[in-house]
């Protein structure tokens, strides 16, 4: 992949839009079985991937509207979050071995009743940044009753935003069924945002060897 990993402290225009009811669920509960060690802790030249994902999420949603779902490495990751982050809420998914659906349920169950939508973010998409998520949130804020998702060759995928009317569907997922299942069912009602940077994720050591970094 030719895109370089870039850094920026710029905030999107929606960063302080805390009254619109958009919350973020960041999934960081997996075991990283294929990689062999926690991908959440994979370090680029500046910080672990999990902290980069949190930075991106906090650029578009207030810290107190961010839920980080931990699981396999709950005890190992909590100190890192305590040292580097504030304001967000940590949710422990004790059933992380049941698959990603269990983490989605844990996150949705922790949302307050006033949440109008949920932004779903992963920790293993290193090229997804604040500007990527800013495009999603801008589209959702124009159409808050619709799902908004990254465009993949095979249809919609994460990162994605689901409106409140679809949150019950997340609770019904099982095993390794993710948000894509719901987005596919929503069909043409899902708004797609071009996001080629989302296509790269870190699952194996080979993926790490392809990861490149920018200097800005």
Language model: regions and residue ranges:
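Short aromatic/basic micro-patch
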Residues: 127, 161, 201-202
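Conserved hydrophobic/aromatic beta-strand scaffold that supports enzyme active sites
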Residues: 147-149, 159-161, 182
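Conserved nucleotide-sugar donor-binding
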Residues: 157-168, 205
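Conserved alpha/beta core of the MobA/IspD/sugar-nucleotide pyrophosphorylase nucleotidyltransferase superfamily
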Residues: 2-20, 168-216
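Nucleotide and nucleotide-moiety/phosphate-recognizing core
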Residues: 16-123, 127-156, 188-195
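A conserved catalytic-core signature of glycosyltransferases
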Residues: 156-157, 162, 178, 197
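Nucleotide phosphate-binding site architecture
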Residues: 32, 42, 167-168, 209
């Amino acid at each position: 992949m030719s895109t370089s990993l870039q850094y920026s402290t710029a905030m999107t225009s929606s960063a302080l839009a805390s009254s619109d009811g958009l919350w973020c669920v960041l999934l960081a509960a997996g075991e990283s079985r294929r990689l062999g060690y926690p991908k959440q802790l994979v370090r680029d030249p500046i910080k672990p991937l999990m902290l980069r994902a949190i930075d991106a999420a906090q650029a578009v949603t207030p810290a107190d509207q961010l839920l980080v779902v931990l699981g396999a490495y709950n005890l190992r990751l909590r100190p890192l979050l305590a040292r580097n982050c504030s304001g967000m809420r940590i949710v422990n998914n004790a059933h992380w071995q049941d698959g990603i659906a269990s983490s989605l349920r844990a996150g949705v169950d922790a949302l307050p009743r006033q949440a109008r939508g949920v932004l779903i973010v992963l920790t293993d998409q290193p090229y997804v940044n604040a500007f990527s998520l800013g495009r999603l949130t801008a589209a959702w804020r124009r159409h808050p009753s619709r799902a908004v998702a990254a465009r993949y060759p095979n249809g919609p995928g994460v990162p994605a935003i689901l409106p409140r009317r679809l949150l019950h569907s997340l609770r019904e997922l099982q095993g390794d069924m993710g948000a894509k299942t719901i987005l596919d069912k929503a069909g043409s009602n899902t708004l797609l945002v071009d996001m080629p940077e989302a296509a790269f994720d870190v699952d194996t050591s080979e993926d790490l060897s392809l990861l490149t970094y920018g200097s800005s």
